[in-house]
């Protein structure tokens, strides 16, 4: 028996007030529908049917590289009609799991529990109890047994008082699902083909119906406007922050970080407020992240420190290395063990060796820098001639004085010293002192210009 997942994603989302299809609006680092697709894949599904309609080009551009069966719903005539479009792709012996592209927070564990309670030849529906069930289809029971689902607009006063509601998520045997869908009618207040009507059909046919509930109601909430989208974003962030804390991170304020990717944390990690994580980020043990830092696709080793307002993108920090405040590490940058860059230092596609330091106001691009090197303030590796990039090599123990320009390609030998204000255009041998600045002149009796009166 195979698991065949149908994801409904055909709606425009008019209340979003956007040209973007509703399901492509993002939660954290990926679209709502991508969250749902990823969850479906985590269940080991044999196939995923994506029912689409509005914004087909944008959907296919965003999702087209994935293993999806694209099912067109040319007219939006209700949820039952949407699922019916996938009938040709459903086998009789499939278990069909129906999900929604605008319900991104549904968890794998919740769906596994739903599938576990589905009878062999029956169906299982995911329900939730809400204090205010307005707008939702009510679960109608008789002597505890589910006999149907009644939509809000079709419900009477007694049914409106029910607070157990339908989430729309259900697991259904393929053979019966196709038969029930073919029997649907649009004779209702909306003039639509309701998927929920198959519950009453199942009851009439004597098919066993079971229910399951999510761990929290937020899992089954959708986003129809940007306010609801923001609420789901906050819920996602709270869940992600909780996961980080359980893994060993100390968050100064869990409500004031943003996690837009996959973050792995070691023990005793300290994270201050307003930090943003994007992409794949790995934090070792005892790492400290200062306020306002941005970490993107980076690897931070044990005991390293990212000081406030530092940007680390596509870079690596070794053990006990530190960066910032107000530093920028661009893709390809690597700080080896105990290396340090300070405020207003930018490093790109370069390695700063063990124990080496660039304390402030420097640009290090396309550079290979050894161990124990001191980079003075105002130092620049001039790596670009307007057409090509070139490498600067600085070997172990070099002292680079302030305001030095190294015009690549150039190599500075071990333990060499470069005088402040020098422009280095030729290789420097080991242990040499090089000074290229103009000789200082003293002009006595110098008169400053006087401002001309107009």
Swiss-Prot record:
Enzyme class of the recorded protein, top EC level: transferase
Ranges where the record places region Pyrophosphorylase: 1-226
Subcellular location: Cytoplasm
GO CC aspect terms: cytoplasm; membrane
Active site: 360
Region called Linker, residue ranges: 227-247
Principal subcellular localisation of the protein: cytoplasm
Pathway: Nucleotide-sugar biosynthesis; UDP-N-acetyl-alpha-D-glucosamine biosynthesis; N-acetyl-alpha-D-glucosamine 1-phosphate from alpha-D-glucosamine 6-phosphate (route II): step 2/2; Nucleotide-sugar biosynthesis; UDP-N-acetyl-alpha-D-glucosamine biosynthesis; UDP-N-acetyl-alpha-D-glucosamine from N-acetyl-alpha-D-glucosamine 1-phosphate: step 1/1; Bacterial outer membrane biogenesis; LPS lipid A biosynthesis
Family statement: In the N-terminal section; belongs to the N-acetylglucosamine-1-phosphate uridyltransferase family. In the C-terminal section; belongs to the transferase hexapeptide repeat family.
Described function: Catalyzes the last two sequential reactions in the de novo biosynthetic pathway for UDP-N-acetylglucosamine (UDP-GlcNAc). The C-terminal domain catalyzes the transfer of acetyl group from acetyl coenzyme A to glucosamine-1-phosphate (GlcN-1-P) to produce N-acetylglucosamine-1-phosphate (GlcNAc-1-P), which is converted into UDP-GlcNAc by the transfer of uridine 5-monophosphate (from uridine 5-triphosphate), a reaction catalyzed by the N-terminal domain.
Summary of subunit composition and partner proteins: Homotrimer.
NCBIfam families cross-referenced by the UniProt entry: glmU, PRK09451.1
Name of protein: Bifunctional protein GlmU
Lineage: Bacteria, Pseudomonadati, Pseudomonadota, Gammaproteobacteria, Alteromonadales
Gene name of the record: glmU
């Amino acid at each position: 028996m195979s698991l065949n997942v149908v994801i409904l994603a055909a709606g425009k989302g008019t209340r979003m007030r956007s040209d973007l299809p509703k399901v492509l609006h993002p939660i954290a680092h990926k679209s709502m529908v991508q969250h749902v697709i990823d969850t479906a894949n985590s269940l080991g599904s044999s196939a995923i049917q994506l029912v689409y309609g509005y914004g087909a080009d944008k959907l296919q551009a965003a999702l087209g590289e994935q293993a999806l069966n694209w099912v067109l719903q040319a007219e939006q005539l209700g949820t039952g009609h949407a699922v019916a479009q996938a009938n040709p792709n459903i086998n009789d012996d499939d278990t069909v799991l129906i999900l929604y592209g605008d319900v991104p927070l549904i968890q794998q564990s919740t769906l596994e529990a739903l599938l576990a309670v589905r009878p062999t030849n029956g169906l299982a529906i995911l329900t939730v109890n809400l204090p205010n069930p307005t707008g939702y289809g009510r679960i109608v029971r008789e002597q505890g047994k589910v006999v149907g689902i009644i939509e809000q607009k079709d419900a009477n006063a007694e049914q409106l008082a029910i607070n157990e509601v339908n989430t729309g998520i259900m697991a259904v045997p393929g053979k019966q699902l196709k038969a029930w869908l073919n029997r649907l009618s649009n004779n209702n207040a909306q003039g639509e083909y309701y998927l929920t009507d198959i519950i009453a059909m199942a009851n009439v046919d004597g098919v066993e119906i079971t229910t399951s509930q999510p761990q929290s109601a937020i899992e089954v909430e959708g986003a129809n406007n940007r306010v609801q989208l923001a609420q789901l974003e906050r819920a996602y962030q709270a869940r992600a922050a909780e996961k980080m804390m359980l893994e060993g991170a100390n968050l100064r304020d869990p409500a004031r970080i943003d996690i837009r990717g996959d973050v792995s944390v070691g023990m005793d990690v300290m994270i201050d407020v307003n930090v943003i994580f994007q992409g794949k980020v790995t934090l070792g043990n005892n790492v400290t992240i200062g306020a306002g830092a941005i970490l993107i696709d980076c690897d931070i080793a044990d005991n390293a420190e990212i000081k406030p307002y530092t940007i680390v993108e596509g870079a690596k920090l070794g053990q006990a290395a530190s960066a910032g405040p107000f530093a920028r590490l661009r893709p390809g940058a690597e700080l080896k063990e105990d290396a340090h860059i300070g405020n207003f230092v930018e490093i790109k596609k370069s390695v700063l060796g063990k124990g080496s330091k660039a304390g402030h106001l420097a640009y290090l691009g396309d550079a290979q820098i050894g161990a124990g090197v001191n980079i003075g303030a105002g130092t620049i590796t001039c790596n670009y001639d307007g057409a090509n990039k070139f490498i600067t090599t600085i070997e172990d123990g070099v002292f680079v004085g302030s305001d030095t320009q190294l015009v690549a390609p150039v190599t500075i030998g071990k333990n060499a010293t470069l005088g402040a204000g020098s422009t280095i255009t030729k290789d420097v041998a080991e242990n040499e002192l090089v000074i290229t600045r103009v000789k200082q002149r003293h002009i006595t009796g110098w008169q400053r210009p006087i401002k001309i009166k107009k």
